[in-house]
Swiss-Prot record:
The lineage of its organism: Viruses, Riboviria, Orthornavirae, Negarnaviricota, Haploviricotina. Residues 1-11, 38-66, 74-85, 127-144, 270-324 have a biased composition (Polar residues). Residues 33-41 are annotated as: N0 binding. This is Phosphoprotein. Residues 1-25, 38-196, 220-352 are annotated as: Disordered. Transmembrane segments: none annotated. The N-terminus consists of a long intrinsically disordered tail. The central part contains the coiled-coil multimerization domain (PMD). Forms a four-stranded coiled coil structure. The C-terminus constitutes the alpha-helical domain that binds to the nucleocapsid (N-RNA complex). Residues 374-441 are annotated as: Multimerization.
Length: 596
């Protein structure tokens, strides 16, 4: 701060002496000492600064031929206070081809400068120089055909003194103030990076300001603002300072920017540049900061406006400037068309990729059967999907697909619920069928058991057979007979005279003929004879058939039943295991014999 104050004192003494036609030796020595100290500070700042990419505002100003002329009047609303250092009087210059290369000024910390920082611009001609300013931490680059001079004044008290003495020169409004912002730093458009003017073929000496000049300046500064948005990517190379120089035929988009002044002091402080002071403020991020990257100083005599065409701030292009006149709108429209075509091409490619992914998704969800074109389907749902994917933008497509997926999932949930209900109904039907089948099996088992019992009873009844006298061809006899009333047979008392009557029934067995003896009499007799011959030991061994059984067999054989019936009774008798079974069997035998 002390160095800045000292420098300001030297400049004030320099300006006070400039009014006189002659300058003493002391003032000249002060100027030389100031220049030497400035160069040493520049070398020190350059040695301390490595790979920072900062650009500094020059404090050394060179000037060429000058001619006395009136102050140029511009048709713009922004105002800069122009100052020429190192000369006896102030001069303003105008370039020959009216085109100035774009110059970039960036602060060391790119933060906002204090409210006391201020830009004073003087324009010279035919200088190509790049020199740093250690006090302000900025650097300016100038080409041979495009010249501009800037100075930073940080002392508020001395700035007020300068404002009372200096003449504010009207500077054309900017043709391009792109909203550049890097690393979250911004200066609200108060840092000026380049100024361009037209060349009138001569340089003019700035005369003293009058009240009429100030009133005219106020009237011009009260014009309405006009803003025109520009894309941020056009000035990326300018912000970074490493971009390649582009073709000068490409015109950068224009942002008309005018400062609306409030009072004479406000009008004199027309433009402030953000620089790094002793205490640099912290960079502020957001949408506030908009760096001024291109300025054009216009001549009042020519009604046309030009644009700055340089895209590289570190490598100034010399001798290749392009004036824009009536063909400006054509170039702007061409650039806009190119950008629009590029964006449309990107949007089209993105939309195509999105549509392909959407078709695959729809195929996986089951909305469509194959990945063919959606236009081939006649289903209303698919037609609706095709219309949305072909016409809507990406956001609408995303919303539509989200809704479609939700609808498909809900549809699937409904189908799942229906399937679950059908499965439950099938389960209940199967349970009913199982119950009926079980009942049927039980009934069949009962019927089978009943049939088997009936068959067993039938077998027992059929084994009895029929009467002997009954003819065989007469047919089947009933198994169950009902007892009818039978005539009672009177018992005849035995009379010995009955034997003489010749009735065989009345003849006793002992007197019967040998021919009518039973067949098994021989067997019986043989058994008796064998038993007599056996020893006493053999008699003690139990025999297979007892005497009772033998006698019963003899009785059955002597009956009047058929041979088949006799054999069946004998077989049943052999199977009997108890006396009760034998008695029951003999009762049945007696019934059969009595029934005949």
């Amino acid at each position: 701060m002390e160095n800045n104050a000292k420098d300001n004192q030297i400049m004030d003494s320099w300006e006070e002496g400039s009014g006189d036609k002659s300058s003493d030796i002391s003032s000249a020595l002060d100027i030389i000492e100031f220049i030497l100290s400035t160069d040493s500070q520049e070398n020190t700042a350059d040695s301390n600064e490595v790979n920072t990419g900062n650009k500094r505002l020059s404090t050394t100003i060179y000037q060429l031929e000058s001619k006395t002329t009136e102050t140029s009047k511009e048709n713009s609303g922004s105002v800069n206070e122009n100052r020429q250092l190192g000369a006896s009087h102030e001069r303003a210059t105008e370039t020959k081809n009216r085109n100035v290369n774009q110059e970039t000024i960036q602060g060391g910390n790119r933060g906002r400068s204090s409210s006391d920082s201020r830009a004073e611009i003087m324009v010279t001609r035919g200088i190509s120089r790049s020199s740093p300013d250690p006090n302000n931490g900025t650097q300016i680059q100038e080409s041979i055909d495009y010249n501009e001079v800037g100075e930073m004044d940080k002392d508020s008290a001395k700035r007020e003194m300068r404002q009372s003495k200096d003449v504010p020169v009207k500077v054309s409004r900017s043709d391009a103030i792109p909203p550049t912002k890097q690393d979250g730093n911004g200066d609200d458009g108060r840092s000026m990076e380049s100024i361009s003017t037209f060349d009138s073929g001569y340089t003019s000496i700035v005369t003293a300001a009058t009240l009429d000049d100030e009133e005219e300046l106020l009237m011009k500064n009260t014009r309405p603002k006009r803003y025109q948005s520009t894309p941020q990517e056009d000035d990326k190379g300018i912000k970074k300072g490493v971009g390649k120089p582009e073709d000068t035929n490409k015109q950068s988009p224009i942002l008309d920017y005018e400062l609306n002044s409030k009072g004479s002091k406000r009008n004199q402080k027309t433009l402030k540049i953000s620089t790094t002071t002793g205490e640099s403020t912290r960079p502020q991020s957001g949408s506030q900061g908009k760096r001024i990257t291109s300025w054009n100083i216009l001549n009042s005599e020519s009604g046309s406006r030009t644009e700055s065409t340089s895209q590289n701030s570190q490598i100034p292009t010399s001798g290749k400037s392009n004036t824009v006149g009536p063909g400006r709108t054509t170039l702007e429209s061409r650039i806009k068309t190119q950008k629009t075509d590029g964006k449309e091409r990107e949007d089209t490619e993105e939309s195509t990729r999105f549509t392909e992914r959407a078709i695959t998704l729809l195929q996986n969800l089951g909305v469509i059967q194959s990945a063919a074109k959606l236009d081939l389907y006649q289903d209303k749902r698919v037609v609706c999907v095709a219309n949305v994917l072909n016409n809507a933008d990406t956001a609408s497509k995303i919303d539509f697909l989200a809704g479609l997926m939700i609808g498909v999932s809900m549809d699937h949930d409904t189908k799942l619920n229906q399937i679950q209900n059908e499965i439950l109904s099938l389960k209940t039907d199967l349970k009913k069928m199982d119950e009926s089948h079980r009942r049927l099996i039980e009934n069949q088992k009962e019927q089978l058991s009943l049939i088997t019992s009936l068959i067993s009873n039938l077998k027992i009844m059929t084994e009895r057979g029929g009467k002997k006298d009954q003819p065989e061809n007469s047919g089947r006899t009933p198994m169950i007979k009902t007892k009818a009333k039978e005539e009672k047979i009177k018992k005849v008392r035995f009379d010995p005279l009955m034997e003489t009557q010749g009735i065989e029934k009345n003849i006793p067995d002992l007197y019967r003929s040998i021919e009518k003896t039973p067949e098994n009499d021989i067997q019986i007799k043989s058994d008796i004879n064998r038993s007599n011959d056996e020893s006493n030991a053999t008699r003690l061994v139990p025999k297979r058939t007892s005497n009772t059984m033998r006698s019963l067999i003899i009785i059955i054989n002597n009956s009047n039943l058929s041979s088949r019936a006799k054999q069946s009774y004998i077989n049943e008798l052999k199977l009997c295991k108890s006396d009760e079974e034998v008695s029951e069997l003999m009762d049945m035998f007696n019934e059969d014999v009595s029934s005949q």
